[in-house]
Each structure stands twice: as structure tokens, then as C-alpha cells.
């Protein structure tokens, strides 16, 4: 991005105002500077590198090193500078001016998730500084402003993505575009449907070979479904498998992947060393199990519970200790099902194993009139949109006095993302008539620390935040 001499001068004045080198921080100086610069069409995402403001060789070196990694560096923006420079001894009046400066930048397109040369978002910078101060300090207010903006942004983007055909076409283009789009959608849908069907067929085949009963839509499957295919398809599939995919983001590829339980049964990993589940989650699972039975009728024969995603079986083991009258477990991966069979889960009294994806197995429960005192969701390779789709089933299957929860790892690799999605979940649950509160569970420092040994051999740390927010969702 290049700027004229006049634009560069304006950009530098913006960064100077956001650095708060002059006190007091006032509307007629600091805030007015931001407003004037924005009105001159200087982007709110302008960076120090755009203006050649690197102060030393070390900063430039760090940027080069990070760019060579697996994240995209944007640069130090005015928001970063506000978060790093706002004085901790600021008055209430100065704080309000700084917050207005941030709001002004957000109105002009400033990004809450842009990364500086150290790979930090503005929220990361503010959080690190506020940790050293009291949580109710002025620095915490700066951090909370970032979280509020991030929440608004994510909710807005979700609404846009849910909208259909957000395009403006001329009458001449409309018909042609519709035809092209339909053909492209049919092709894409066909590919995705084929992948899903193949993954389901593979899972059913392995489950049947292991002697398991397979139930889909409430009916027992006697034969493995046959799919149309030929040797050329198999050859193409083998070739595609050689290209590494993101197993954490692709359910079809995940269901085809070989999973491994470590010898000590403390970790379940993919062939890419993704941590599907790890035993550091034990305390979280214990308290989640306690939660799931907390609202059950004490005069009944025992709670009726559902867990989606078996993993290491931690939460299901705790649930068994609660003496449930009915205990449903939904699991789709053939390697996990094999482990469950080996460990005797298929023969436990009151346990019903739903073999397959929850999208395929839970609808059958709706027609059977099953209601749960507690429902838990903890899947791998699914996205937030899948969790929101699961809310539909919660509404239909949760007893009026029941409680729903899930493994809340949304954005847990950054505190600011974790806090933003904590709020986003609340907004989405409200649309389904569900209320949510959070119980805070402290996570062991061996997990959150920079040198956490529990991550040895794991491809990517999926948890860095200090507190786990356990969702308590009720009608």
C-alpha cells in the first residue's frame, strides 16, 4: 500500500494521536485528529510499515520470521497502538476519549482480528497489559471495547452469511447467472454428498464387521449401503488422500482417517497428530457430567442423558457413575467405535450407542419421543455453524427442566476470540429460546503455559486461555 506525501503526513499524525504522547487525552485534540484523518480517506487499517515507521531492525526481523510461518501478518494498526500506549493512570475522562477514538476507527473499518508483527491482535495486546493490572482497571475497559466490537462484527457476518442471494444483478444477467450458479451448486453438492455417503458407508461397514448394531433414523441397518463407483474413483481417492488435508475442518476426511489411542490412553490423535481429545480435559468433563444430571428429577429411576462424541470416554465414564436410567452415546468414527466395543461399552446396561453422525441418528429420537435431562456436544472436525445446527435438536430433545452444554473451545487459542465467541453463543442461543450462563473452571498451567509439556507431539495447541467457560444452557 502506497501513499502520497500528504497522506503519509496524515497517517503519521494518526499514529501520533493514538500513541498518547501528549496529555491530557482530549476530544478536541486526539479524537478530532482521528476524525479528520478518517474523513480524508486514510484507511483505518493503515499500518506502521505502510508508513515506514519501523523503529528498529529487530521489529522488521520479527515480521519476516512470522510471515514465513503459517499466519498472515497485517502490521501494527492504530488500534494496536492505542492498546499498547494507553496510560494505565488515565482519568475517567481520558478513558472515554480513548474509547471514542476506538469506536471511530471501528466505524471506518478497523479490524479487531488484524495481526501485528508479533502475531498479536489489538485485543491480545490489551489483554496482556490488563493482566498486569486489576481486572477493573482502565486497561480492562480498553480490552472490553475490543471484545464488544468483535462480537458485533461476528454476529453481523453470521447474519450476512445466513442471507441468501445477496447479489444485485441486472435483468439481462439474472437468468444467465442463475443457470450457472445452479450447475455449480449441483456439482459441488454432488461432490460433498458423495463424500459424506462414502464416509457413512465406511463407518457402517466397519461397525458391522465389529458386530455392532447400527441405527439410522431410528431403524436398524442390516446391510452396508452400496455406492456407485469404479476403480477409477478409488484411484482418484487414493491420489487425493496423499495430499494433506485439514482433518480438524473436514468431517469426511476425518471419518476416513486412522485414529490412534496412546498406550496410556491419555490422548486420541489423528495421523496428522491433531489432538482429538486429551486427558487434561478430565476436570472439565467431570464438572460437565455433574451439570448434566443436576436438574434431573430425584424421584425418577435415574437421569436420561446424551453425549455426542465419545473420544476418550471421560465424560461418559463420569455419567455412568451417576446411574443414568438411559445413557445415549453418539459416535461416528469407526476406530472409536472399535475401542468402545473392546472396552465393553456396547454391553453396559442402559447404554445405547448411536452409530453414525448425529445429523443422521438424532432425528430418529425425535420421532420416538425421547427427552433428555442432560445433553452434551463434543465433536471433532465440525465448525461453529454445525454447533448452531445442533441447537435445533436441543430444542426438540431437551426436557423442559433439562440442561444442555458443550465443550467450549471456541476461539480458545486467543483470549480475545474466546471472549468474543462467549458472547456470540449467547446471541445465537437466544434465537432458539435458550438462556446461557457460564461456570468458570481454572485450567492447569501445564496446559496454558508457554512450555506446557502436555502438548508434546501434538500438531497444534488448541487451548491457551486460563479459564474454561462451561456453558449452562436451559429453557
Swiss-Prot record:
Residue ranges of every copy of the RMT2 domain listed in the record: 247-475
GO BP annotations, alphabetical order: methylation
Keyword Cell inner membrane included in the entry's annotation: no
InterPro entries: Arginine_N-MeTrfase_2, RMT2/GAMT_Mtase, RMT2_dom, SAM-dependent_MTases_sf
Binding site for S-adenosyl-L-methionine: 254, 285, 310-315, 331-333, 358-359, 378
Transmembrane segment boundaries: none
One term under GO cellular component: nucleus
EC number from the UniProt entry: 2.1.1.-
Subcellular location: Cytoplasm; Nucleus
Compositionally biased spans, kind Acidic residues: 169-194
Keywords of the record: Cytoplasm, Methyltransferase, Nucleus, S-adenosyl-L-methionine, Transferase
MF GO annotations: protein arginine N5-methyltransferase activity
Domain of life (superkingdom): Eukaryota
Disordered as annotated region, ranges: 167-194
Quaternary structure (record): Monomer.
Function: S-adenosyl-L-methionine-dependent protein-arginine N-methyltransferase that methylates the delta-nitrogen atom of arginine residues to form N5-methylarginine (type IV) in target proteins. Monomethylates ribosomal protein L12.
Family per similarity comment: Belongs to the class I-like SAM-binding methyltransferase superfamily. RMT2 methyltransferase family.
Annotated protein name in UniProt: Protein arginine N-methyltransferase 2
Originating gene: RMT2
